[in-house]
């Protein structure tokens, strides 16, 4: 069902403790006091702890009627003069398409809430693809993304929108997403790249497209096949023009998540980029912007 048809029919990983993550003077951002930094960090950790607790609940405990469901808005757009439609990533229901009636009206309780990267609790009704959003509450404020980290966050959102089907829960995806946002916040360029590569690898694995060596283990170099797996390339082999290969050491580091060496990080970017492109019908918009900035 297309989005327009839906609208017509509608009318993990554990999180560290606060003590382990408390920032010291070296982590202080310009213009921020130690007390202010600690308050922001503790608020963020409280949100992440709540998400972690809820994520640990068995899937069988998922309520039939969603209420106060932890969620992040991936994308929202106007639907009419007074309403919005939005895609949200939720903890237990996966990616959900929501109609927020009257959300643009000055007196609406939803006004200003449906923005990316803000942790929310959402309540909705409906059995069709387009659900009716009835309530939204802020869970709290996470440290904001800005600059190139913000663009990286939009890239993460676009990956989820393009690779994840609506209402497919994908256990572990919500925690993976939250971890990516946390890792992008305040990170230097090199750490942002590592965070993006980890998210790409985790997302491909959750979708059943994990990049792995399927043939030619121990070969000196590897190539990515159109099936999304890596195959060994014998020394002296002649390949078609444009086929990219990577040394065994780099491939081993990438698959093991060892991205400290610049060569391994570069190989991870190239391998996961190609693996994702195999699953897309058209290029990613945010990747094009980030590529112009030479960070993706």
Q: What are the residue ranges of the model-derived segments?
A:
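Non-catalytic alpha-helical scaffolds and adjoining flexible linkers that form interface surfaces
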Residues: 2-21, 25-85, 89-296
């Amino acid at each position: 069902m297309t989005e327009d048809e839906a609208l017509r029919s509608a009318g993990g990983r554990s999180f560290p403790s606060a003590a382990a993550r408390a920032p010291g003077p070296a982590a202080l951002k310009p213009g921020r006091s130690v007390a202010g930094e600690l308050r922001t960090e503790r608020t963020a950790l409280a949100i992440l702890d709540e998400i972690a607790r809820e994520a640990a609940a068995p899937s069988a405990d998922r309520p039939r009627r969603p209420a106060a469901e932890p969620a992040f808005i991936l994308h929202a757009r106007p639907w009419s003069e007074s309403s919005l439609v939005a895609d949200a990533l939720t903890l237990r229901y996966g990616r959900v398409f929501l109609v927020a009636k009257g959300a643009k009206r000055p007196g609406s309780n939803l006004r200003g809430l449906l923005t990316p990267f803000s942790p929310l609790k959402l309540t909705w009704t409906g059995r069709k693809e387009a659900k009716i959003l009835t309530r939204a509450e802020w869970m709290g404020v996470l440290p904001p993304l800005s600059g190139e980290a913000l663009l990286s966050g939009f890239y993460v959102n676009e990956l989820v929108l393009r690779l994840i089907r609506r209402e497919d829960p994908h256990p572990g995806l919500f925690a993976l997403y939250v971890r990516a946002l946390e890792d992008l916040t305040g990170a230097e360029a090199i750490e942002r790249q590592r965070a993006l590569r980890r998210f790409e690898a985790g997302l491909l694995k959750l979708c059943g497209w994990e990049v792995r060596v399927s043939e030619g283990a121990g070969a000196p170099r590897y190539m990515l096949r159109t099936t999304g797996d890596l195959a060994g390339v014998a020394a002296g082999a002649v390949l078609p023009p444009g086929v990219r290969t990577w040394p065994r050491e780099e491939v081993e580091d990438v698959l093991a998540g060892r991205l400290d060496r610049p060569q391994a990080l570069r190989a991870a970017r190239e391998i996961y980029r190609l693996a994702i492109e195999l699953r897309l019908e058209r290029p990613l918009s945010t990747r094009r912007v980030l590529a112009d900035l030479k960070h993706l």
